[in-house]
């Protein structure tokens, strides 16, 4: 009998419900036992693999023969924060479907700011016909923070459209067609950025990086009348009081936010009704769960053939 797959899944939308994941993995892994922990009985000694989403701290210690952990989402901060996490490879999801969806989201919102869609939506509501001068994409400087798989793809698609694109990452990266900055060059990167797109992982080093100090360094001479931020990374990357304060005093012209420190976003949050904020419910890259389950099944099969795992997380860096 092949090594069992344990599912440890907390919360999620209907499509991410734990029972739905059991159905998917039973379908794509018909040759191995699949157990939804908390519902299904299984001998812990049989479990070789775990597919997880926001597992409770310490939950994986019950499997002494665990060989690989698969995180079902792109962000692994909730997993690596567990001090008791077994010392086995942690694999993050990196399917093409997720990358395409994130790029769609980023490109859509950069274009909406570039083409002043917020202004025209307001004009429509007020029945005002008042076109504004429109600049070319080459006149807008977009800066992408985070040059992993998602950031690289979004940056390159934006560049193909014609935007002036640069990227920043903690360690040096090279992306064809993109001006790349790293580490201590953050200030230089921010100074040439009109629209700041954040796709960083959440680590101790990046927590709270979207703050007033960062926003103060953004370009002030751009075509949009002030800098704009787009955060589709993690809620912990942003200091929300700083965002609100900077929107109110003009340090920021607008913000698009897909993630928040508390989710679901509380009904009394000022973000809901702020005229300079566009928000979405953490679904910028809501990946097809069927694609994720196939990805995990293929990784397990390759691992059992002796092939190396792909997209293994570095525990020290958190990505």
Positions of predicted regions on the chain:
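Glycine-rich, N-terminal phosphate-binding loop of Rossmann-like dinucleotide-binding domains
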Residues: 54, 73, 198-201, 233, ...
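Structural alpha-helical scaffold elements that stabilize or flank donor/cofactor-binding regions
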Residues: 42-43, 59-62, 188-192, 270-271
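C-terminal helix-to-coil terminal segments
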Residues: 89-93, 97-105, 119-120, 263-319
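Rossmann-like adenosine-cofactor binding region
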Residues: 172-270
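Glycine-rich NAD(P)-binding loop of Rossmann-like domains
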Residues: 120-153
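Phosphate/diphosphate ligand-binding glycine-rich loop within oxidoreductases
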Residues: 48-124, 135
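NAD(P)-binding Rossmann-fold cofactor-contacting core
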Residues: 160-177
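N-terminal glycine-/charge-rich "phosphate-binding" loop or analogous flexible N-terminal tail
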Residues: 1-47
């Amino acid at each position: 009998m092949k090594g069992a797959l344990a599912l440890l899944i907390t919360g999620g939308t209907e499509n991410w419900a734990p029972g739905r994941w059991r159905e998917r993995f039973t379908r794509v892994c018909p040759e191995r036992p699949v157990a939804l922990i908390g519902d299904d009985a299984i001998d812990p000694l049989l479990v070789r693999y775990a597919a997880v989403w926001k597992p409770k701290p310490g939950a994986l210690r019950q499997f002494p023969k665990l060989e690989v952990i698969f995180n079902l989402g792109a962000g692994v901060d909730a997993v690596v924060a567990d001090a008791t996490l077994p010392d086995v490879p942690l694999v993050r999801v990196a399917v093409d479907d997720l990358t395409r969806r994130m790029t769609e989201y980023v490109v859509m919102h950069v274009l909406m700011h570039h083409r002043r869609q917020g202004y025209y939506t307001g004009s429509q509501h007020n029945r005002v016909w008042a076109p504004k001068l429109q600049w070319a994409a080459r006149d807008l400087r977009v800066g992408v923070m985070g040059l992993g798989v998602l950031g690289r793809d979004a940056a390159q698609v934006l560049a193909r459209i014609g935007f002036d694109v640069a990227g920043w990452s903690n360690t040096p990266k090279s992306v064809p067609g993109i001006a790349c900055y790293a580490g201590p060059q953050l200030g230089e990167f921010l100074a040439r950025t009109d629209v700041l797109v954040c796709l960083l992982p959440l680590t101790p080093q990046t927590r709270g990086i979207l703050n007033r100090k960062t926003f103060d360094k953004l370009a002030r001479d751009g075509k949009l009348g002030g800098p704009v931020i787009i955060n589709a990374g993690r809620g912990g990357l942003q200091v929300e009081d700083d965002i609100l304060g900077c929107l109110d005093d003009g340090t920021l012209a607008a913000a698009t936010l897909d993630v928040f420190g508390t989710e679901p976003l509380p009904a009394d949050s000022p973000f809901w009704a702020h005229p300079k904020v566009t928000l979405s419910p953490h679904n910028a890259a809501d990946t097809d769960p069927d694609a994720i389950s196939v990805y995990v099944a293929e990784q397990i099969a390759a691992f059992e053939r002796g092939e190396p795992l792909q997209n293994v997380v570095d525990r020290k860096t958190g990505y």
